[in-house]
């Protein structure tokens, strides 16, 4: 049985852990901070082992794959140790995308993405479509994939959520705008932040499935 370790037990991490457990993985969750009671209850409900307040390296470094919550930087010491071992490190969105055939409409941008995501979701819902709202708003995508059956997902994605995404492909990708933000996470390099945002389009095979704001200088 393959071992999945989830780092971080917030909305993203707890959801990823439930999906991993449902799919038959040996699952362990570790959070350096205190875990909220509602997430402890969720993990306990599915019989998932967890720890809080510290990372026990011997329980983490033996993972076959790690699902990293978006709040953990890629240069954190534990992440660097996992990289040195060659352990694959992916995002919750990447993990969840493996287990659903639902159509994905994904929105990112420095400003306005929550409003746009909510509007698209409302349009889908009003049209009678079976749609879930996920990502930076709504419930964890992984948790919905594990416990619900949606035909469509409208997903708001921050740059942090786009990090550690490699094979995930949106059916429709919307990139609204890019302005300087979170640059401390990207070595104060604007290009690295831009690259993170453009991860949303990395697997697009049809130009018609990508919506770029061509009036925005950085994107155009």
Question: Where are these predicted regions, by residue range?
Answer:
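N-terminal leader/targeting and accessory segments in enzymes
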Residues: 1-91, 95
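Short alpha-helical scaffold segments that flank and stabilize functional sites
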Residues: 19, 23, 99, 199-200, ...
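Charged/polar, solvent-exposed surface patches and flexible loops
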Residues: 41, 45, 98, 143, ...
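Single conserved hydrophobic/aromatic residue that forms the stacking wall/gate
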Residues: 208, 212-220
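Histidine-centered active-site/metal-ligand motif
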Residues: 54-55, 182-183, 216
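Phosphate-binding loop of NTP-binding sites
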Residues: 58-61, 70-208
């Amino acid at each position: 049985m393959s071992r999945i370790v989830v780092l971080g037990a917030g909305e993203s991490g707890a959801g990823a852990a439930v999906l991993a457990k449902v799919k038959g993985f040996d699952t362990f969750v570790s959070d350096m901070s205190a875990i909220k009671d509602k997430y402890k209850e969720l993990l306990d409900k599915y019989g998932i082992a967890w720890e809080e307040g510290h990372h026990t390296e011997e329980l983490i470094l033996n993972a076959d794959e790690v699902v990293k919550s978006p709040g953990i930087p890629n240069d954190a010491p534990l992440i660097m140790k996992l990289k040195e071992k060659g352990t694959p490190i992916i995002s919750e969105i990447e993990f969840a995308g493996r287990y659903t055939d639902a159509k994905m409409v994904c929105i990112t941008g420095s400003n306005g993405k929550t409003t746009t995501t909510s509007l698209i979701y409302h349009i889908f819902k009003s049209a009678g479509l079976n749609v879930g709202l996920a990502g930076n708003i709504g419930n964890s995508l992984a948790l919905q994939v594990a416990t619900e059956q949606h035909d469509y997902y409208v997903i708001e994605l921050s740059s942090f959520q786009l990090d550690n995404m490699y094979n995930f492909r949106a059916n429709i990708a919307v990139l609204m705008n890019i302005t300087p933000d979170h640059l401390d996470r990207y070595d104060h390099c604007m290009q690295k932040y831009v690259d993170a945002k453009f991860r949303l389009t990395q697997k697009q095979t049809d130009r018609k499935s990508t919506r770029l704001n061509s009036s925005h200088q950085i994107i155009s």
